[in-house]
């Protein structure tokens, strides 16, 4: 049969693998989505398995790149002319918005992967016309190729923009490798741009979100929902900036520093703007927001609503922002686009026009700028910066560096000649190795001592998991290195069972002290290493007791962080609301996901795949790693032995599962014939039999010939988690 060629059939995919028609999630929208565990697979990476970005970046002539970027700043292009003859403001905004999606709750977002190139970020209303900034950069990216990623280039360009306008930056670190597909993140519940269904009660912003409306980076510049109230706007500002790890001083510095440069664009009717890049025409070639107002660019540019120029020198670093903020009284005004903004009352026209040197304008501000004057806390900081420009410059330099590097993880990931020497508390510093590490004979002797200490398999496995599983692949925070499980706040987290944890750590510290005290050659073992080694020893014993010999890989080199190197408030966000691997839910905290969704979310943060998630849960259950020694999901008669019993018994058709009477989210597994209670489990346990894909993984491990594969796969997945924060090992392997 010939394919249809009428209009109804036009554009429809004629083969079964196409993207049209209903997908599984359209039919079953409540189905647990585990696709996030398989994003950014090697199949989508055009660089190939052998490519090592860190090694390529080391070959880069950074000064040459910066020289080209400096030249670009004033090389105004006819197709997108530079305001005031300088692209500095545009590129500062590009870098800011690349980094500004970062949120501290789950560490996601940020500049670390170059996601601004992809949907939805490339088409967010708040990112309007940043597609032009990236196109301006393309010749430079093309010139230096794989030696600099888009992620690094966008941040570096923001730095060079600031430097070209007379500002001294704090430094720059490379090392952000690009990804090659959009990140599927929860950006909010809204189905419309600029919707704000994320609020409840007295303007309570839902977690883990950071921005006030869908498609904004932070706050609405016109005020909450367009209400031009600077004091109310300050509340939004404080909340959103706190959710990306900024305090009040950093917030003031960032807003004022960023708004020292450039302008906003609201020259005309916003309805004349075309679709965003993802909805644009094929011939637009990935550009969006094509405007029919006047020329569509330059003096006629429309990016949002406001048309604001903050300072008299928008291409030079100055203190004019604060001088204007406090030097004038402000009256409400409207931009040519109809947006609410403020103009200096009775002021002379001292601000330059971006394209006509013969014209001048009066100073203008956004509602959110005035928040820095009318919020009492911000006002105090702002006046100090007004009177002490050097303090302002230092605060902005440090806050800008934090903004653009917050999601890069520890300093050992920083690359390049401009890495600052100063160690900063938000980098979660860990001491460098300053002693000889334990060798193979020491490792075996220490394992024997640990197993003879009276600590159980369950205690050792639980402690090692608690230490390592704080890792977040999103912002590279957490992990076993540093042994912060012995420090506040982690030692007091409910999930870590503080009383029992203290007993375990006390015994491990005694072993550590005895070993280190007996050495005469400077050799030492850190508690961080000993915690992980304890888990390895326990797993080897549990496997042996199940009849399977295995050696758990162990690489020493972790160090112990101090309380002075640990920001307690910053680490509080790493406390899990739920940890399905330990069958734990914090009933005192609001849960915004079902337990099985939280399990997948945590697995994604740990960079685990679906099979790795599956084998870890099955193994941890039989090893007794559950919170508070709960028996839910411990589907074995042989606890603390590394068997595949969890999968065998979960998939046993001789068991019928029903909800337990009066128990929320607890299920009973009874003998199908006589009704005798055999097991209890949670949603997290039963999902491995209910979800078709997870069940397929579980079936692999439930087979009669699967014991050795199960143990081998469990050890591999376990080792991946234990070493997730060992960037030193990764660097050595990549270099080799």
From Swiss-Prot:
The protein's name in its UniProt record: Catalase-peroxidase
Cofactor binding description: Binds 1 heme b (iron(II)-protoporphyrin IX) group per dimer.
Ranges of compositional bias, category Basic and acidic residues: 1-10
Amino-acid positions noted as binding heme b in the UniProt annotation, renumbered to this chain: 259
Catalytic reaction(s) noted: H2O2 + AH2 = A + 2 H2O; 2 H2O2 = O2 + 2 H2O
EC assignment: 1.11.1.21
Superkingdom of origin organism: Bacteria
Record gene name: katG
Classification via InterPro entries: Catalase_peroxidase (IPR000763), Haem_peroxidase (IPR002016), Haem_peroxidase_sf (IPR010255), Peroxidases_AS (IPR019794), Peroxidases_heam-ligand_BS (IPR019793)
Pfam entry (one): peroxidase
A cellular component annotation (GO) from this entry: cytosol
Species of the source: Rhodopseudomonas palustris (strain TIE-1)
Cross-link (Tryptophyl-tyrosyl-methioninium (Tyr-Met) (with W-96)) at residue(s): 218-244
Post-translational modification: Formation of the three residue Trp-Tyr-Met cross-link is important for the catalase, but not the peroxidase activity of the enzyme.
Function according to Swiss-Prot or TrEMBL: Bifunctional enzyme with both catalase and broad-spectrum peroxidase activity.
Protein keywords: Heme, Hydrogen peroxide, Iron, Metal-binding, Oxidoreductase, Peroxidase
Stored PROSITE patterns: PEROXIDASE_1 (PS00435), PEROXIDASE_2 (PS00436), PEROXIDASE_4 (PS50873)
Active site: 97
Residues marked Transition state stabilizer (site): 93
Annotated segments matching region Disordered: 1-26
């Amino acid at each position: 049969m010939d394919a249809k060629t009428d209009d109804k059939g036009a554009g429809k995919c004629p083969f079964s693998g196409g993207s049209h028609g209903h997908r599984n999630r359209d039919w079953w929208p409540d189905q647990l989505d585990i696709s996030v565990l398989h994003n950014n697979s090697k199949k989508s990476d055009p660089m190939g398995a052998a490519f090592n970005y860190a090694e390529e970046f080391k070959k880069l002539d950074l000064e040459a790149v910066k020289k080209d970027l400096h030249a670009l700043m004033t090389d105004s292009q006819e197709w997108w002319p530079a305001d005031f003859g300088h692209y500095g403001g545009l590129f500062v905004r590009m870098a800011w918005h690349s980094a500004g999606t970062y949120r501290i709750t789950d560490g996601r977002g940020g500049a670390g992967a170059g996601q601004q190139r992809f949907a939805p970020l490339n088409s967010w209303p708040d990112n309007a016309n940043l597609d032009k900034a990236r196109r301006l950069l393309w010749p430079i990216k093309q010139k230096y190729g794989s030696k600099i990623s888009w992620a690094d280039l966008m941040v570096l360009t923001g730095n060079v923009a600031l430097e070209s306008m007379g500002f001294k930056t704090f430094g720059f670190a490379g090392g952000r490798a690009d990804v090659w597909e959009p990140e599927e993140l929860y950006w909010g519940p809204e189905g419309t741009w600029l919707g704000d269904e994320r609020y409840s009660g007295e303007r309570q912003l839902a977690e883990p979100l950071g921005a006030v409306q869908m498609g904004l980076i932070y706050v609405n510049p016109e005020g909450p929902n367009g209400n031009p109230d600077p004091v109310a706007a300050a509340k939004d500002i404080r909340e959103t900036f706190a959710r990306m790890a900024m305090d009040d001083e950093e917030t003031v510095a960032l807003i004022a520093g960023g708004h020292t440069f450039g302008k906003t664009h609201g020259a005309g009717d916003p309805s004349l703007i075309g679709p965003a890049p993802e909805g644009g025409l094929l011939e637009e070639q990935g550009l969006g927001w094509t405007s029919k107002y006047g020329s569509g660019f330059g003096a006629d540019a429309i990016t949002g609503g406001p048309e604001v120029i903050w300072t008299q020198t928008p291409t030079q670093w100055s203190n004019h922002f604060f001088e204007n903020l406090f030097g004038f009284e402000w009256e409400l005004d409207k931009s040519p686009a109809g947006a609410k903004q403020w103009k200096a009352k009775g002021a002379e026209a001292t601000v330059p026009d971006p394209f006509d040197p013969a014209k001048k304008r009066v100073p203008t501000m956004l509602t959110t700028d005035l928040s820095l004057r009318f919020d009492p806390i911000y006002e105090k900081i702002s006046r100090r910066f007004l009177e002490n420009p050097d303090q302002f410059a230092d605060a902005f330099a440090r806050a800008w560096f934090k903004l653009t590097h917050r999601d890069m993880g520890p300093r050992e990931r920083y690359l390049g000649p401009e890495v600052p020497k100063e160690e900063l508390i938000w980098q979660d510093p860990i001491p460098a190795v300053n002693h000889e590490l334990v060798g193979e004979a020491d490792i075996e002797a220490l394992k024997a001592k640990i197993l003879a200490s009276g600590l159980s398999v369950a205690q050792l496995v639980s402690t090692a998991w608690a230490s390592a599983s704080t890792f977040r692949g999103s912002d590279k925070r957490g992990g076993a290195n540093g042994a912060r499980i012995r420090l506040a706040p982690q030692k007091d987290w409910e999930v870590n069972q503080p009383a029992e944890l203290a007993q375990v750590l006390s015994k491990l510290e005694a072993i550590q002290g005895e070993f280190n005290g007996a050495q005469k050659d400077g050799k030492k073992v850190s508690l961080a290493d000993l915690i992980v080694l304890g888990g390895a020893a326990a797993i080897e014993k549990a496997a042996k007791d199940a009849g399977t010999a295995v050696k758990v890989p162990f690489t020493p080199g972790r160090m112990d962080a101090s309380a002075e190197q640990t920001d307690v408030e910053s680490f509080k966000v790493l406390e899990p609301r739920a940890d399905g691997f330990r069958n734990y839910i914090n009933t005192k905290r609001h849960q915004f996901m079902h337990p099985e969704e939280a399990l997948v979310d945590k697995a994604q943060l740990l960079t685990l795949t679906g099979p790795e998630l599956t084998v870890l849960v099955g193994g941890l259950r039989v090893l007794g790693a559950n919170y508070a020694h709960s028996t839910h999901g411990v589907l074995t008669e042989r606890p603390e032995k590394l068997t595949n019993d969890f999968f065998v018994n979960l998939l046993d058709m001789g068991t019928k599962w029903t909800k337990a009477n009066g128990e929320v989210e607890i299920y009973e597994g009874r003998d199908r014939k006589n009704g005798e209670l055999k097991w209890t489990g949670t949603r997290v346990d039963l999902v491995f039999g209910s979800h078709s894909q997870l069940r397929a993984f579980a079936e692999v491990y439930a087979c009669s010939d699967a014991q050795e594969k199960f143990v081998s796969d469990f050890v591999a997945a376990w080792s991946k988690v234990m070493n997730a924060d060992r960037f030193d090992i990764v660097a050595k392997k990549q270099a080799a």
